[in-house]
């Protein structure tokens, strides 16, 4: 979860007592409902003031109360994101074209001899473009095969950019991983160049080889989503998570159709921050299609926002010295945060019950102002409790500015086929639109029990992060209702040690696991674990995709 607006995210943190949680027992029904929403998800927020007039008295009173507390936040509600300037490249620029309509029209003989589609899903609106990227032209992982391109939905004018890096090791057998950054509204190319990709960008705006890249033993796809993030673009807007699920299913289906040499390998989805929203939806969408060419084996969520009702109860403990690091706030501020917690949790609970923007938006604004503000006003880095925010214009990290400058260069955009006129690491408008559509506190954690029935789920958390801290991630994973809840919650944290290199035996964190569910605490990692602890990050990643814990 990137904090993109000090106005929206100023507040208090919360108490150590575990909050109550309503979990929908019929998680399969919930998953089906979420997936069905995808058809209506590509609709920007419109006519907010007109709709406000039709609210019930109680809902209107809540909005007016929050508006009085935080007028600048509420004034942002009617605004929409502007389309990105772009120039579509001619078909001759691309090496490969895949038509979703043609893929959907492939029929095969079923088990009983009847004709059936080779793959499920509505793909007719989608097309995939791809080109070979010359590694030597960019100086990024020379000798490693790379593809980049766009998933196009021309009906809705959506164009999602991706960049694929083949495994450095054994690409014919190594797994494939989709990586997603959060925000909402932040480019996954920041994850590529700041965290786990084959290169970082130095202060001279030059690529530097990354020995700890996750493509050491896996092929990795970095996807800029939702639309109007990074190199992706659209003439419209998007304001919630469910649309992404169908887009990602289409992207993967068409990509593996064009490049079948990767389709039989194990496939995993990994991401951080607001990807704690994205990943349960995307994985549920994939698993809902019985006939698919996507060999989904697991998901990994790092320092994610997944269950706000539980997680917001752990801002006060983390800020006040109970997360393993010295307190950032004084005793009186910690007490005021305790005092705000019950109101915040009751508002989130109401959002969980209704999932209405008119309930969820006030909850988001109140809780973000009440739960995050005291910490944020100290100037401390919300992504790393150990230091100050060094560059407010780049979300506290100078390196993000280097990445933006590099990816904005015309030569780089030409090399990867980017069609936008520039590059921004994060789109503040998308962040605001998601919040004002009520997506922030939607209970997407209710999809996780359905995932656990079919695939392993890893929740990992760097223990120096504040914004999506390890205390809250541990708490929600233990509170989740699923058949193995009791055994998982009661399991003790055990030492996580390096086993694969010269530092064998070094403690890098703690782990607990039962059935298909695993939680990891990574020592010394902030919001971006692979950046802060590259050795530890690659260690647990390699062992996870190798199947050690499932």
From Swiss-Prot:
<dbReference type="InterPro" id="IPR029058">
    <property type="entry name" value="AB_hydrolase_fold"/>
</dbReference>
<keyword id="KW-0865">Zymogen</keyword>
<keyword id="KW-0121">Carboxypeptidase</keyword>
<feature type="disulfide bond">
    <location>
        <begin position="351"/>
        <end position="360"/>
    </location>
</feature>
<feature type="active site">
    <location>
        <position position="273"/>
    </location>
</feature>
<feature type="active site">
    <location>
        <position position="465"/>
    </location>
</feature>
<dbReference type="GO" id="GO:0017000">
    <property type="term" value="P:antibiotic biosynthetic process"/>
</dbReference>
<feature type="glycosylation site" description="N-linked (GlcNAc...) asparagine">
    <location>
        <position position="217"/>
    </location>
</feature>
<keyword id="KW-0926">Vacuole</keyword>
<comment type="similarity">
    <text>Belongs to the peptidase S10 family.</text>
</comment>
<dbReference type="GO" id="GO:0000324">
    <property type="term" value="C:fungal-type vacuole"/>
</dbReference>
<dbReference type="GO" id="GO:0072330">
    <property type="term" value="P:monocarboxylic acid biosynthetic process"/>
</dbReference>
<dbReference type="InterPro" id="IPR008442">
    <property type="entry name" value="Propeptide_carboxypepY"/>
</dbReference>
<dbReference type="Pfam" id="PF05388">
    <property type="entry name" value="Carbpep_Y_N"/>
</dbReference>
<feature type="propeptide">
    <location>
        <begin position="18"/>
        <end position="131"/>
    </location>
</feature>
<keyword id="KW-0378">Hydrolase</keyword>
<dbReference type="GO" id="GO:0006508">
    <property type="term" value="P:proteolysis"/>
</dbReference>
<feature type="disulfide bond">
    <location>
        <begin position="186"/>
        <end position="426"/>
    </location>
</feature>
<dbReference type="InterPro" id="IPR018202">
    <property type="entry name" value="Ser_caboxypep_ser_AS"/>
</dbReference>
<protein>
    <recommendedName>
        <fullName>Carboxypeptidase Y homolog A</fullName>
        <ecNumber>3.4.16.5</ecNumber>
    </recommendedName>
</protein>
<feature type="active site">
    <location>
        <position position="527"/>
    </location>
</feature>
<feature type="disulfide bond">
    <location>
        <begin position="344"/>
        <end position="367"/>
    </location>
</feature>
<dbReference type="Pfam" id="PF00450">
    <property type="entry name" value="Peptidase_S10"/>
</dbReference>
<keyword id="KW-1015">Disulfide bond</keyword>
<feature type="disulfide bond">
    <location>
        <begin position="389"/>
        <end position="396"/>
    </location>
</feature>
<dbReference type="InterPro" id="IPR001563">
    <property type="entry name" value="Peptidase_S10"/>
</dbReference>
<feature type="glycosylation site" description="N-linked (GlcNAc...) asparagine">
    <location>
        <position position="516"/>
    </location>
</feature>
<dbReference type="GO" id="GO:0004185">
    <property type="term" value="F:serine-type carboxypeptidase activity"/>
</dbReference>
<keyword id="KW-0645">Protease</keyword>
<feature type="disulfide bond">
    <location>
        <begin position="320"/>
        <end position="334"/>
    </location>
</feature>
<keyword id="KW-0325">Glycoprotein</keyword>
<comment type="function">
    <text>Vacuolar carboxypeptidase involved in degradation of small peptides. Digests preferentially peptides containing an aliphatic or hydrophobic residue in P1' position, as well as methionine, leucine or phenylalanine in P1 position of ester substrate.</text>
</comment>
<feature type="signal peptide">
    <location>
        <begin position="1"/>
        <end position="17"/>
    </location>
</feature>
<keyword id="KW-0732">Signal</keyword>
């Amino acid at each position: 979860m990137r904090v993109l607006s000090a106005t929206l995210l100023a507040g208090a943190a919360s108490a150590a007592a575990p909050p109550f949680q309503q979990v929908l027992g019929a998680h399969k029904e919930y998953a089906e409902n979420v997936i069905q929403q995808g058809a209506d998800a590509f609709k920007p927020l419109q006519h907010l003031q007109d709709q406000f007039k039709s609210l019930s008295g109680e809902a209107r009173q809540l909005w007016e109360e929050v508006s009085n507390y935080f007028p600048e936040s509420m004034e942002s509600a009617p605004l929409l994101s502007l389309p990105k300037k772009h120039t579509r490249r001619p078909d001759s620029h691309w090496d490969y074209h895949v038509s979703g309509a043609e893929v959907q029209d492939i029929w095969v003989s079923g088990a009983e001899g009847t004709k059936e589609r080779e793959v499920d899903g509505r793909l007719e609106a989608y097309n995939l473009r791809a080109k070979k990227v010359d590694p030597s032209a960019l100086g990024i992982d020379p000798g490693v095969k790379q593809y980049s391109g766009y998933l196009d939905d021309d009906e809705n004018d959506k164009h999602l950019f991706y960049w694929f890096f083949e495994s450095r090791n054994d690409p014919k057998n190594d797994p494939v991983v989709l990586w997603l950054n959060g925000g909402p509204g932040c480019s996954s190319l920041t994850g590529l160049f700041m965290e786990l990709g084959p290169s970082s960008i130095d202060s001279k705006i030059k690529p530097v080889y990354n020995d700890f890249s996750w493509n050491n033993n896996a092929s990795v796809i970095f996807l800029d989503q939702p639309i109007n993030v990074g190199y992706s673009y659209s003439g419209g807007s998007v304001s919630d998570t469910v649309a992404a699920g169908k887009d990602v299913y289409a992207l993967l289906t068409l990509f593996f159709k064009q490049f079948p040499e990767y389709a039989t390998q194990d496939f995993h989805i990994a991401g951080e921050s607001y990807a704690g929203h994205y990943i349960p939806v995307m994985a549920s969408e994939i698993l809902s299609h019985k006939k698919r060419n996507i060999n989904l084996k697991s998901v990994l969520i790092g320092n994610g926002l997944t269950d706000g009702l539980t997680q917001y109860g752990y801002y006060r403990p983390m800020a006040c010295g109970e997360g393993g690091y010295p307190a950032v706030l004084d005793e009186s501020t910690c007490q005021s945060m305790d005092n705000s917690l019950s109101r915040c949790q009751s508002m989130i609970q109401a959002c969980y019950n209704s999932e209405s923007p008119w309930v969820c938006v006030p909850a988001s604004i109140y809780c973000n102002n009440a739960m995050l503000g005291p910490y944020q006003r100290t100037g401390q880095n919300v992504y790393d409790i150990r230091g100050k925010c060094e560059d407010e214009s780049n979300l506290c990290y100078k390196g993000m500015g280097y990445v933006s400058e590099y990816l904005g260069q015309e030569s780089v955009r030409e090399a990867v086929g980017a069609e936008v006129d520039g590059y921004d690491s994060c789109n503040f408008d998308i962040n605001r639109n998601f919040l004002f559509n009520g997506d922030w506190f939607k209970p997407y954690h209710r999809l996780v029990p359905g995932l656990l029935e079919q695939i392993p789920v890893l929740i990992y958390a760097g223990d120096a992060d504040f914004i999506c801290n390890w205390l809250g991630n541990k708490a929600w994973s233990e509170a989740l209702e699923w058949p193995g809840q009791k055994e998982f919650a009661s399991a003790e944290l055990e030492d996580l040690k390096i086993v694969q290199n010269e530092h064998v035996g070094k403690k890098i964190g703690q782990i607990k696991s039962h059935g298909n569910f695993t939680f990891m605490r990574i020592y010394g990692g902030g919001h971006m674990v692979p950046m802060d602890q590259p050795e530890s990050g690659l260690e647990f990643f390699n062992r996870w995709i190798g199947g050690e814990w499932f």
